Amino acid sequence: MPKVTRRQFIQASAMGGALLALPPSIRKALAIPAHRRTGTIRDVEHVVILMQENRSFDQYFGTFPGVRGFGDRFTIPLPGGRSVWQQAYTDRVILPYHLNAKRGNAQRVNGTPHEWPDAHQAWDDGRMSKWPVAKTPTSMGYFEEQELPFQRALAKAFTLCDVYHCSMHAGTNPNRLFLWTGTNGPTGANVAAVLNEWDGPGRADEGYRWKTYPERLEEAGIRWKVYQYLPDNFGDNSLAGFPPYREASVRAGNPANPPKGFNAFVPYSDAINALLPLYKGNGNTLPARHNDDLEGMLAGLRKDVRDGRLPQVSWIVAPQRYSEHPDGSSPVQGGWYTREVLDILTENPEVWSKTVLLVNYDENDGYFDHMPSPSAPSPRADGTFAGRSTVPFDTELFRHPAPPGSKLQPAPDGAVYGPGPRVPMFVVSPWSRGGWVNSQVFDHTSVLQFLERRFGVREPNISAWRRAVCGDLTSAFDFANPSPSAPPRIAAMTRTVVETLRERQEAMAQVPVPAVEKQGLGLQRRFARPSRALPYCLEVSGSVRASGGVVNVKMVNRGAQGAVFHVYDRLRLEEIPRRYTVEAGKSLADDWRAGDAYDLWLLGPNGFHRALRGRMDEAQPEVTAVEEGRALWLTLTHRGSTPARVTIARCPYTSAGPWEVLLQPGESVSRRFETSSSGGWYDLTLDGDKGWIRRLAGRIETGEHSISDPLMGA
C-alpha cells in the first residue's frame, strides 16, 4: 500500500477533491461568506435543526469515499471467522446489497422493524452477528450516489459526521425526546419511555412530565420556534406529548383529541405567542391549504428569513411525504425538502452568514450499520456488567418505571438505552464548508450541547455519562478561519422531477436480495478526506501474568473527551463484549482469565485499535505507546528469562520497515515512529515467538486538522 503523498494531502485538505458538480442551492450556500465579528461560536446567531427519519449511516454513506464505511479497516469480529458484513440469516449469510433504482423500487424500499425489542435483538449487546434475523433481509440494503444525489452533494460541500449515533436502541419518539429534552425520562422524572407514545395532540392531564429545552430557552429570553404543518407532522414532534404544550394548543382553540382528518388547526400568530408562548412548539406554525400545498407549508419559514425574523433556535418538522421515512417517503423526496430549506435560508445572505443548519436522522429504522455503538456496559445474567465506567451510568439502563398514565411502555428489563446505531449528520454552515468529515462521537444530546455552548442555556437532563462520551459538535466548525468555496452550477431536481421518479419507482417491485453466489460488498473508493482535529489522546497497554492465567489491560485517556473502548474476546465471541467508558484524564484496568491462550480485539474512536494475542505458558514482552507531536514512541519491555525476538512489520502508511528487535531478559527498547507524512495515521504489527502478536493502530491528534484514514477503501 503506497504512502500518502504530499500532493494527496494538499488536495484533501483544500476541498476534499469532491466538489465537481453541486446543486444551485448548495452552490449558493457556499458562495455566502461567514459573518465574522469575533471569530468564535459567538458569530452564530441562528441554529436551525432539521431531523429527518429512519436512515442508518452505512445505508447512505457506506460507499462514500473518506468516511468510516465499507472500507473500515478495523471492524468487530464475528463467530466462525465471519466479517461483520457477513450477517447470519436462517441458512445463509447476507451481505450489504445495493438498492439499485435501476433494478427495482429502491426509493420506496420497505421499512423494517425498529422498536425497542428488535433493536436489542439486532444489536445483541454489541455482538451484532444476526442483524437480518431481527430486522429482515431488507435491512442490509444500501444506496449509492445515483439514489442519493442531494445527500451526497451536501456531504461533499459541507461537513459529514461519521460517528454520530442515534440516542437509543429504539424508535422515533424515544430518540426525538433526546433531541428536545436531553433524555427519555430517567434524568428528567425518574421514568423511562422506550416505545412511541404521546406523539400527537392529547389531553393536558396526560403526557411526559419533565422540562423541555424550549421551555428553558423561553425562560432565558432566547427566541425559538418549531416550524411544522398540522395536521401532517408525521408524529415527529415530541413536544406534543408534554402537558404544557398540550394545554397551549387547547387554549389556542384546538381540540384536545382531534378527529381523524381534522385540518382546521389554529394558525400560529404573534398575538397568540404573546399569550401562549409554548404554542410555537406544538402549534400550526406553517399553515397550508392542504397536504399538497408545499409552498404554503414553507411560506412561514420563508417570510421569517426574508424579514430577518428567523429565531435564534429553530426546529423544522417535515411532513410525511418529505420526511425520508421508508415506505412513506424516499431519499429523493427528503433531499428535495432539505434543498428547499437551504434555498430559503440562503435567500437572505445576511441571515445565512450567521446560520448553522444541522440535518440529522432520528434513528436507523432497522437498517444495518456495522460500527458498534458506544453504549454503556451491558448487564450480564448474573447481575455483573460486561465492562466498567469511570462515570456512573445508572441513567443509561432501563430500570425506570413508565411515566404515570402510560399504557404502552413495557416493564423495565435492565437493558442499555444507548446510544444506538450511527445515523447521518450534516453540519451545513459558512463555518463548515469544504467536504470535511468529523469523526468525534456524537448523539442527539450533542445538538443540545451545541446550543448550550452558543446561548448559555444548560440542559440538566443530559446525563453525566452522555456528556462524558458525546461531544458538543464544536469540533465540526472552524469559526476562526472558515473555508471559502464556490463550486460550479448544475441543474437540480425539481419537485416535479422528484415526484415523477418516486411514482416510477413505486410501479416497480422491491429490489431483491441477491443470491448467495452473487453477493459482494459494495466498493468504497480510497480517498483521504479533510478531517477535523479531534479531542482524543488514548493509550492502551496489556500485560500477562502467566502464572495466574491473567491478561490485564489498562486504558488511559489523556484527551479532552471521554471515550468508550470495546473489547472482544475472539476466543469467546459468544460472551458479551466488554465496554469501558473512560472519562478525560482518567484510566481503567481490567483482567481477563485465560486458558492456554488469549486473543483480545479492542476498538476505540476514529479507528483506534489494539490487538493482543499469545499463549500463557511464559513471560512475554510488554508494549507501551506514547504520543509525542506527530510521532509515536514504542517501548518494548521483556520480563522473561530467555531472549525474545520481535519483528515490527512494515508500516502500510509509510512503507517504512520491517524492523527486528532482540530483547534480552529484563531489557527495554524504545523506537520512534514518525507519522507526519500520513496525517498522523499509524498501524504497527509486532510479531514474536509462539504466536505472540501486538497490533497498534489509530491517528495521533495534535490539535491540527488532518485527513481521514487514507487506507480505508480500495
Language model: regions and residue ranges:
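N-terminal pro-sequences and low-complexity stem/linker regions of secreted or lumenal proteins
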Residues: 2-714
